[in-house]
């Protein structure tokens, strides 16, 4: 049992030549029914020292298994900053734009570059972390029916406006 857990994900990118870099970590603890609702980078909960350890563990793990492509290592963290490996997603996750906004790195482009057999176009020291990003998911649910999925026709859509705003939809 982990009291007050935090779900932290580390984004990595690796190539066939043994190069692996991290692109920071995301806080994914705000969930409902095991579905992420809010993702944030960097996590305001994780101390810098712990973040550095976690990022190093993620990169080393991927190097040891020879992983190449985009991937996400998921960890559970307790209130004392101890972290535990949960799983690795060997794909690009829905929340990857949070990482792109904080690094300026186009993860889709680089995933294609690596899949084509090319080396990563950057080294760890080339990646600059700047600012913070938050992703909020909107679910179509019926609050009067235990929040069951509620498909329907979208009749009005008003996009938010403002600086530094990215709007992705599917």
Question: What is each model feature region?
Answer:
Residues 1-170:
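ATP-dependent carboxylate activation and anion-phosphoryl transfer catalytic cores
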């Amino acid at each position: 049992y982990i009291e007050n857990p935090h779900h932290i994900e580390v984004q990595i990118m690796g190539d066939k030549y043994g190069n692996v870099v991290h692109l920071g970590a995301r806080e994914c603890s705000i969930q409902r029914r095991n579905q992420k609702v809010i993702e944030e980078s960097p996590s305001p909960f994780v101390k810098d020292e712990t973040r550095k350890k976690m990022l190093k563990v993620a990169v080393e793990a991927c190097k040891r298994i020879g992983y190449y492509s985009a991937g996400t290592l998921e960890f559970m963290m307790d209130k004392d900053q101890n972290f535990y490996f949960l799983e690795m997603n060997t794909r690009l996750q829905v929340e990857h734009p949070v990482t792109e906004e904080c690094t300026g790195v186009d993860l889709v482009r680089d995933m294609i570059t690596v899949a084509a057999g090319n080396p990563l176009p950057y080294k760890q020291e080339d990646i600059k972390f700047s600012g913070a990003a938050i992703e909020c998911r909107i679910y179509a649910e019926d609050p009067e029916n235990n929040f069951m999925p509620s498909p329907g026709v979208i009749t009005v859509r008003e996009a938010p406006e403002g600086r530094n705003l990215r709007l992705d939809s599917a």
